[in-house]
Amino acid sequence: MRIGTPNSPSAVRVMLLGSGELGKEVAISLQRYGVEVIAVDRYAGAPAQQVAHRSHVVDMTDPGAIHRLVEFERPHFVVPEIEAIATDALVEIERAGLAEVVPNARAVQLTMNREGIRRLAAEKLGLPTSPYAFADSCAALAEAAAKIGFPCFVKPVMSSSGKGQSLLESPSDVQAAWDHARQGGRVGASRVIVEGRIDFDFEITLLTVRAPVSGGDAGIAFCEPVGHRQQAGDYVESWQPQSLNPKARERAEAIARTVVDALGGRGLFGVELFVRGDEVWFSEVSPRPHDTGMVTMVSQAQNEFELHVRAILGLPVDSSLRRPGASAVIYGGVAAEGIAFEGLERALAVPESEVRLFGKPEAHPRRRMGVALAAADTVEEARRRAVLAASRVRPVKIPA
């Protein structure tokens, strides 16, 4: 791999579609190798835009806007960081040879749609999943929920971070769940997936790297499993490693390898799985760094962002664990623009702790504005430290 100089004819150019906190870390990792970074988002001042060489504000659900921007910037790689993207434009860009889409346009298109990835995993690949059905009206949702059985979960086929998700306890919940899903869905979607509830012991994210190896073939590397705790479909803390018994570990890696190889391309994938004893079920997969994987910034030899970048650039990867670690989310707490944070000196007094503030220009009470990270000799101590550090960071609304 030859890498030139940013802002020169020799530069390797990467365009990030989506410039949130995960994209910011990807941008920083890219810049360590002298890659020219172009950050794109729907609003100005997004986290990755603050560290990129250039930035653009566009409607990423507009195929024409995406196509025109790629033609203007001529990146070598287009790296999606979010789901709310006009994936048809990525297919056209890839087909025309304008840029390499990471991991590839088909993978991005399938994984941004819960119906696409569920049908691939369950019906084509034969992977174990929860029972499921799809619905595109309130009446169809009622029928699907009755078929799957109560309690069950309802999710828009296109959404992220828990948006639009509901737990249905009885038929009386259907209308509210349908309305909530329509409000939380993306790209004008009004279709939902109904999932049966699995009685699992815990959830994991198995960060899986698909990267070129000698001879040009793609090799697979696994990080240690990441455990996480969610509220309302969004993660609030994660830790690594999550202990699995040998049989469950073998099954988890087999499922992850199968789905990642089926998607193809190169990069890091966040494969979400349910685990109960020896049993493992596929849940979802993201073809990019995963929010629960932010813990790897203190736990691994190379964090998930570095692994993603190395896979993209064809560089050697090392997914080994160095030390148990944990992360805990820091929320906005208030609804305001340009908030401040207090208590960092107390947070960083926690042993082996770090804090990342994302720099998002606008806060909401439940918006993720930062994360506390901690390492320790044990996962339990790392979790305690991360939660303590996060609790000491206080968002403050600045008077106008």
Curated annotation (Swiss-Prot):
GO molecular function, one term: ATP binding
Binding annotation for Mg(2+): E272, E284
Keywords from the UniProt entry: ATP-binding, Ligase, Magnesium, Metal-binding, Nucleotide-binding, Purine biosynthesis
Enzyme Commission code(s) on record: 6.3.1.21
Biochemical pathway: Purine metabolism; IMP biosynthesis via de novo pathway; N(2)-formyl-N(1)-(5-phospho-D-ribosyl)glycinamide from N(1)-(5-phospho-D-ribosyl)glycinamide (formate route): step 1/1
Phosphoprotein among keywords: no
Annotated binding of N(1)-(5-phospho-beta-D-ribosyl)glycinamide, by residue: E21, L22, E81, D291, K360, R367, R368
Descriptive protein name: Formate-dependent phosphoribosylglycinamide formyltransferase
Species assigned in the record: Methylococcus capsulatus (strain ATCC 33009 / NCIMB 11132 / Bath)
Organism ancestry: Bacteria, Pseudomonadati, Pseudomonadota, Gammaproteobacteria, Methylococcales
